[in-house]
Design a protein with these regions (language model features):
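Immediate flanking context of iron-sulfur cluster ligation sites
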Residues: 28-45, 64-67, 130-131
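Non-cytosolic membrane-interface motifs at loop->transmembrane helix junctions
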Residues: 44-54, 80, 110-113
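Iron-sulfur (Fe-S) cluster-binding segments and ferredoxin-like electron-carrier domains
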Residues: 52-67, 117-121
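Extracytosolic (periplasmic/ER-lumenal) interhelical loops and adjacent juxtamembrane/interface segments
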Residues: 103-147
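Structural signal for the C-terminal ends of transmembrane alpha-helices
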Residues: 2-7, 65-73, 164-173
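A hydrophobic membrane-anchoring alpha-helix module
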Residues: 133-173
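Interfacial segments of alpha-helical transmembrane regions
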Residues: 14-25, 72-94, 164, 168
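C-terminal TM-helix exit segments that contain a strictly Trp-centered aromatic cap at the helix terminus
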Residues: 30-39, 89-105, 125
Length: 173
């Protein structure tokens, strides 16, 4: 186990980079398992913004998995950190949009729109992305709340943590 000194926080022990990448993958797999549990067992249907956030979590998981197998050196770690940042920033933007929609007064919430699968079947892909990013009434429904945060709030926290963790992996050397 290696140590990374942080000025005001003291020492934080970090595992070797390959193990850290593997742990990142396991966390993403756990988040996806939780999402499927909420959907299929608890009956919470994901809105289109939720589905796009799931894509971001899967992308992050695949980047972590590739890093675990590759075990990159310093330059490779910077590349993985950049990829993790792009994927987590994209997810954070989606989650931020959903948190904003959830904060709107009821009379300002957009009307419910088409389901994602229907949009994918009938609209050009660019229009699907535009409509999903605009949000709809179902995206404003908080559904499940824990410690005052909706699922979108928790995923936003996850995406921010991943952006930071990706660059912490670079500091391993």
């Amino acid at each position: 186990v290696m140590a990374l000194g942080l000025s005001s926080l003291g020492l934080i022990l970090l595992p070797p980079r390959r193990i850290a990448f593997a742990l990142g993958f396991v966390v993403c797999a756990g988040l996806m398992a939780w999402a499927f549990w909420l959907e299929h067992i608890e009956g919470l249907s994901p809105c289109p913004l939720c589905m796009f956030q799931r894509v971001a979590v899967v992308a992050i998981g695949l980047i972590f998995l590739a890093g675990a197998f590759h075990d990159p050196g310093r330059v490779g770690a910077w590349i993985y950190a950049g990829l993790l940042f792009v994927a987590s920033a994209s997810g954070a933007a989606l989650a931020t949009r959903q948190v904003w929609l959830q904060s709107l007064p009821k009379d300002q919430v957009p009307a419910c729109g088409m389901g994602l699968s229907y949009m994918m079947d009938t609209l050009p892909f660019v229009d699907v992305i535009r409509r999903v990013l605009e949000g709809s009434g179902e995206c404003a429904d908080k559904g499940w709340v824990f410690l005052g945060l909706s699922i979108a709030g928790w995923t936003l926290s996850f995406f921010v943590a991943i952006a930071v963790a990706g660059f912490a992996l670079v500091k391993r050397d």
